[in-house]
Amino acid sequence: MEIIVNRESFINSLRIVSSISSEKLRPVKLLISQGVLKLESEKADYGEVVDEIEIGYEGDPFQIGFNSRYLLDVLIVIESEDIKLECKNSMSPTIIKSTVDESFLSVIMPLRVEW
């Protein structure tokens, strides 16, 4: 699967959603469907935070989890307006690419997220 997402929107949404997650893992769940990326995080004491952003994606809905800190670390250094996420399934490594600079490539491992 391949997703195109606005980098700044993704960063802002991740910061909002991860604001309540635990300091150690900072888990965030990405629910991907046609045209929409829904980000979720929760903490037992505080509840759940959900945010949605528009994306370029045409395919079957699926979900994948990540450590939000790792995602933010990659997104902050990319110097393009949009980024591309590529992965095979919810447990395979995800490749993050710039849509402008073909030399930029980062790989991030998913996190099993259940709630």
Positions of the model-derived regions?
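DNA polymerase processivity clamps
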Residues: 1-115
